[in-house]
Regions:
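Active-site neighborhoods and metal-handling regions in enzymes and metal-associated proteins
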Residues: 1-599
Length: 599
């Protein structure tokens, strides 16, 4: 079936239930960014494969909202579907709640699967549509009636992350969170987020591709903890370890029953941005809801000393693999056929040679030429193209190791470049280098740092329509909060001070539709720089250790400070990576990291 046929079947089910709109989000039951195959309902209906987007289906129309990363991709994938693309944040584009208010009649009904809609999103729709007395119908997953060959829920075995990697035991983490619960006056904490449950219990799984988490909820009280999980995924050994730490098991779907059974007067802590709407609706009226940002978010974001040191080890392994890949690509292109997909598979094979390699951390982006202008392009059998010994290849990839999670982008010159390609590459590199060299007082947020990366681009009348940086988990999601580097304060729902020990990305870019794209990305860890009479200064230490492409740099556009920072980074790369290379690869690394001279 194509999207037109699928939407027609969905509308039949909507009509049976007198629904005036049906909302399909990207999320699973845990508001996760990346989801398992079972939860890709929006992709199934629309054909749009991006990681962010919401579909609204009306009786006679449909619209899909996505952000700037996916404008070009979505416009291509939605062609012929009858679905209108709503470019979020652009002039004249309504937000979803306002759209629903304007298109659903008085006393009408909006349907959705309330397990996949966050409480905050449902609340925002309710507030906007209240004046028209519009009601919700959230008990049914109508997509399930249309998607006849839908994949089953994943149920992969859990595994334990040793304390040598995590740095804190399960008991220590539980005590920390219970301490925060006391401070916040909560007697029960409902934890629906997969990454938070995994972090708190030092457990990992394989229920979501690229993200080592498992389908679960945790109900935490001061004297006990209940893990709602698919029992067959938990070995007897892990169950015994959990029991010794005061954690008992319950069936995965029991979370709603357990919440509904909470006694009168219970003060229930939950994060409305991360808890689904059905959980909130299950809370008894006699209980009090404390809708607060989850305290685990900040705990998880500030990496332990052990996590930081392990991440350094992971990035050395990753740096070796990516450096070898760049050497291979530059020396093989034009001599034998290479496509985007074959290059992607080559890089994965090099990473897999590293000790403790687990999997990729997201779908690899290997984008040649004009494909590089599609911010989150992912090569498929249908879109794969051969690469030639000219132009640019944008490679945004990452990996999961026992020692940590990586995410790196390098834009690689495959041969001769145009003056425009070199100019754009160099401007992006300048912004990347300048953010990487930031020294700032504690108390700054990502909004304060963002302009360092964008200034060289703004001065040239250029910009990019995505964040400059996102937090990264430890053997968890490649994207995590609460830290974020972005200039647009209006889009920031929650502001976060940058703390020592946080790890986030530094990834400015420029994308010229139909031509090429450039993005350069390192992960950095926040460290203390100095403390003096003015306060506590922080700085950014690069974790990613892979050379930039000197073949793509226009040295005349670099300042003397840029040159100094470039040479210092390359010296660090050579010192860390060279012991693991030999022969021609080592000789190439020497050339790639040789100091450049200021013009």
């Amino acid at each position: 079936m194509n999207p037109v046929e699928k939407l027609a079947l969905l509308r039949v089910e909507m009509k049976k239930r007198h629904l005036d709109a049906y909302v399909v989000v990207t999320d699973d039951f845990h508001t996760s960014e990346y989801v398992g195959a079972h939860f890709k309902a929006r992709e199934f209906l629309s054909g749009f494969t991006g990681s962010a987007g919401t579909l609204v289906v009306l009786p006679d129309a449909a619209a899909l909202w996505t952000d700037g990363r996916y404008f070009l991709q979505a416009s291509q994938q939605l062609e012929g579907s009858g679905i209108e693309l709503m470019r979020m944040g652009q002039p004249g584009v309504p937000e979803i709640p306002a759209f629903l208010r304007d298109h659903v009649p008085e006393n009408g009904w909006i349907g959705f699967d309330s397990r996949t809609i966050s409480n905050d999103f449902a609340r925002s729709i309710g507030e906007k549509t209240r004046e028209k007395h519009i009601r919700f119908a959230g008990d049914e997953d109508l997509v399930d009636l249309v998607w006849t060959d839908r994949p089953a829920l994943s149920c992969e075995p859990l595994w334990e992350l040793d304390v040598q990697y995590a740095g804190l035991t399960r008991r220590e983490k539980l005590a920390m969170v219970r301490g925060k619960m006391k401070e916040m006056g909560a007697s029960v904490f409902v934890i629906p987020s997969l990454d938070e449950v995994a972090w708190l219990l030092n457990l990992r799984g394989n229920d979501v591709l690229f993200t080592p988490v498992f389908l679960s909820y945790l109900l935490l009280e001061q004297d006990k903890a209940t893990l709602c999980v698919q029992r067959e995924a938990v070995s007897a050994e892990i169950e015994a370890h959990l029991k010794s730490d005061g954690v008992t098991l319950a069936p995965y779907d029991d979370i709603y029953r357990l919440v509904a059974a909470l006694p009168t007067g219970t003060r229930v802590l939950l994060d409305g941005e991360r808890a689904n709407y059905r959980i909130l609706q299950s809370v008894p009226e006699s209980a009090e809801v404390l809708d607060r940002t989850s305290p685990i978010q900040l705990m998880k974001a500030v990496k332990t000393p052990a996590e930081q040191e392990n991440e350094r080890l992971a990035h050395i392994k990753d740096g070796v693999a990516v450096t070898r890949f760049i050497y291979w690509l530059k020396h093989t292109i034009g001599k034998e056929p290479i496509t985007e997909l074959s290059a992607s598979k080559k890089l994965e094979s090099l990473r897999a040679e590293g000790e403790h390699y687990l999997e990729q951390s997201f779908d690899p982006i290997l984008a040649y030429g004009a494909h590089g202008a599609i911010v989150h392009y992912e090569p498929t059998e249908e879109t794969d193209i051969p690469m030639e010994p000219r132009g640019l290849c944008l490679a945004d990839t990452g990996a999961q190791y026992l020692e940590g999670t990586t995410d790196i982008t390098r834009t690689i010159a495959l041969g001769p470049l145009t003056d425009e390609e070199k100019r754009i590459y160099t401007l992006v590199l300048r912004g990347h280098i300048q953010l990487g060299a930031a020294k700032f007082l504690h108390g700054c947020m990502g909004e304060n740092l963002d302009m360092l990366a964008r200034t060289p681009l703004w001065e040239a009348g250029l910009d990019f329509n995505h964040g400059t940086g996102h937090g990264v988990g430890f053997v968890l999601g490649v994207h995590e909060g609460p830290e974020r580097v972005h200039w647009d304060v209006k889009r920031q729902k929650r502001h976060c001070v940058i703390e020592e020990g946080m790890i986030f990305s530094n990834e400015p870019g420029i994308y010229l539709a139909g031509k090429f794209g450039v993005r350069i990305e390192n992960l950095v860890v926040v460290r203390e720089a100095e403390v003096n009479e003015y306060g506590r200064f922080l700085a950014l230490e690069p974790l990613t250790l892979v050379p930039y492409d000197r073949d793509a740099i226009d040295l005349s556009l670099l300042s003397s400070r840029d040159v100094e920072l470039l040479n210092a980074y390359h010296a660090k790369v050579f010192a860390a990576i060279s012991p693991y290379l030999s022969g021609d690869e080592l000789e190439w690394l020497k050339e790639a990291t040789e100091p450049v001279q200021f013009c």
